[in-house]
From Swiss-Prot:
Protein's gene: rplU
Pfam families: Ribosomal_L21p
UniProt keyword annotation of rRNA-binding present: yes
Name of the protein this chain belongs to: Large ribosomal subunit protein bL21
Organism: Anaplasma phagocytophilum (strain HZ)
Biological process per Gene Ontology, one example term: translation
Key words of the record: Ribonucleoprotein, Ribosomal protein, RNA-binding, rRNA-binding
GO cellular component: cytoplasm; ribonucleoprotein complex; ribosome
Function of the protein: This protein binds to 23S rRNA in the presence of protein L20.
């Protein structure tokens, strides 16, 4: 059985025992979090698309930061160059149960 969950404005396809990286959640390591399920499916492909029909229970494994992305802006012939980096704070979750 798998589900499509939404957190941080993004959607993830998960099944039990999956480990996913999501945007930072305010939960401590080892805590359980409940993610709302947009759709749940059985292994044969049948399922429901109701948001109220299911939920996904996950455990916080760790907090980390994503890889750095470089933002470089330049205007040719004007000696205008700006270089910035960004690292997003992430939470690593292990899916415990899909309901």
């Amino acid at each position: 059985m798998f589900a499509v969950v939404e957190t941080g404005g993004k959607q993830y396809k998960v099944k039990e025992q999956d480990v996913i990286k999501v945007e930072l959640l305010k939960a401590g390591i080892g805590e359980k979090v409940l993610l709302k399920s947009l759709a749940t499916f059985n292994n044969d492909g049948s399922g429901s698309f109701s948001a109220s029909s299911g939920s996904v229970s996950a455990e916080v494994v760790a907090h980390c930061r994503s890889d750095k992305i470089i933002v470089f802006k330049k205007r040719r012939r004007k000696n205008y160059r700006r270089k910035n980096g960004h690292r997003q704070n992430m939470t690593v979750l292990r899916v415990v149960e899909v309901r």
